[in-house]
Amino acid sequence: MSWQWRRRQWPSPLLLILIVLHLVSSSSAIDFLYNSFSSVTNRTDVILIEDSRVESTVISLINDSDPLSFGRVFYPQKLTIIPDPTRNPTRLSSFSTSFVFSILPDISTSPGFGLCFVLSNSTSPPNAISSQYFGLFTNATVRFNAPLLAVEFDTGRNSEVNDIDDNHVGIDLNNIESTTSVTAGYYDSVNGSFVRFNMRNGNNVRAWIDFDGPNFQINVSVAPVGVLRPRRPTLTFRDPVIANYVSADMYAGFSASKTNWNEARRILAWSLSDTGALREINTTNLPVFFLENSSSSLSTGAIAGIVIGCVVFVALIGFGGYLIWKKLMREEEEEEIEEWELEFWPHRFSYEELAAATEVFSNDRLLGSGGFGKVYRGILSNNSEIAVKCVNHDSKQGLREFMAEISSMGRLQHKNLVQMRGWCRRKNELMLVYDYMPNGSLNQWIFDNPKEPMPWRRRRQVINDVAEGLNYLHHGWDQVVIHRDIKSSNILLDSEMRGRLGDFGLAKLYEHGGAPNTTRVVGTLGYLAPELASASAPTEASDVYSFGVVVLEVVSGRRPIEYAEEEDMVLVDWVRDLYGGGRVVDAADERVRSECETMEEVELLLKLGLACCHPDPAKRPNMREIVSLLLGSPQEDLLTGLTPAAAAADSTAAHA
């Protein structure tokens, strides 16, 4: 009898296990709703990093007063993504989240940036370039397994990472280049049609993300606030590879970055749950940062009277207003050309001419965008093709100085430079007009497994072309032109696949025998000469260094920096080490090695690239010597000092 009584008092072992599991599960569960951020505090309710901050009821990710800004915000408690990482590392758990965001640029035609929802095992992801790539990633397009996964809401098009357009949603697996992406829009729940919309007009946008761990699937839906959640997701990604980019516990949050262009990015509300159904966001009273809807207490009759009165008023003054408007437009056009502009290179296009050529700067004509601005393809009335680059300057003085240099460069004439045809100014926006290069940029033919790899003879020719163009800039014109941003993406290919050096937005001019008056470091990581890190002024030698990196890129088929989980690969150091070991031809692209009957020319160019990248700028060849060597003239003195032993010493000096 007593045994039976005790049995009734104690639960079974199975029940105890279930209770413990339930308690553990409950203690780690996350289920929250922020319909406003007015009362949140840093580190307690959310983790605010860098420039992210609470502004009234919303979280602002970016500081518009800082030209290079980034911000992140995370929920302080980590999500459990892999419940049992030791015994079953590929069994993932699930969660759902929904949030409302707003993206509003200062200038509608400026480059866009966007924001990301992110899962990361760290609030400071390693190797992230803070002011670019959403403040999360590097500029490498080679993926490596690490716990970082993002859903990007991208409002800029970067052709270097194969963005599909400047208004899309994508899945990023520890890489700025999306694994999959789709134009922003939603599927109508009634007729099933796909409705596109603009994420970059300041209007509130609602996003829903379902992370289905057991099925390795991510569903993303996005729609303007006011649209019910679509039945069909905007984007679905299903692949077991997801398991490679998550860890046992991960922070959930948002990240964004910017360069010189202002684009406010705000999180207005956020809900997340890993226990089941989401708590619903109330979007009724959320702030609106563009075209605010104003409520009215006026009666229908009063509103009708106001409308009728307005119609009568417009009818009375319409014709006169039209005449005044036409007069003001003519005066504005006349005032648009200021006296100081007449000093400069005179080929000035009208805005109407460029608008017609680009279909009013249509997204369908967009070639690319970046920190410099947007580039559009255009067709003039004479059927000639052009590329129009839109650049914004905040001050008239800065615009005038920029115009002075651009006008000088407009007089540059060489077959291996992208020819500038003219310009147009509209207020503080400058539009530069160039010849259109139909075959894109060199990097598109070298990296990322292009459909038609560039054969060796064309690679060799492009190196020659760029060398001759750069030699002209350094030695062949009235002034010395320092390009300062030589890289494979700034080398464009014409209809005959001949290389032309383009993008002179960072270039500086000075007299022969003089020196540039700037020490500001600009350019692209991986191409910058080491002496620039010590505030040295850019010179012909720093351009030669960048050219040497391009030579090594073209011959090896590898990027200047390839980021990896354990150690980054710096191209110059890698080739120098191979040369120091007597194996420099091993650096050549496999496609090149299989094509060439002899490796002598390949070895010569690799050695030339190393000579151009010498750590000591005084020991680098100049462009005259380089062109002479490439054209076949004996220049043994350029390379005689470049022995394997010397390469090893250079490598030591470079890392000192």
UniProtKB/Swiss-Prot annotation:
Q: Where in the cell is it found?
A: Cell membrane
Q: Which SUPFAM superfamilies match?
A: Concanavalin A-like lectins/glucanases, Protein kinase-like (PK-like)
Membrane spanning segments where?
305-325
Known catalysed reaction(s)? L-seryl-[protein] + ATP = O-phospho-L-seryl-[protein] + ADP + H(+); L-threonyl-[protein] + ATP = O-phospho-L-threonyl-[protein] + ADP + H(+)
Principal subcellular localisation of the protein:
membrane
Residues engaged in binding ATP: L367, G368, S369, G370, G371, F372, G373, K374, V375, K389
Family (UniProt): In the C-terminal section; belongs to the protein kinase superfamily. Ser/Thr protein kinase family.
**The protein's name in its UniProt record:** L-type lectin-domain containing receptor kinase S.1
* Species of provenance: Arabidopsis thaliana
Record lineage: Eukaryota, Viridiplantae, Streptophyta, Embryophyta, Tracheophyta
Its encoding gene is what?
LECRKS1
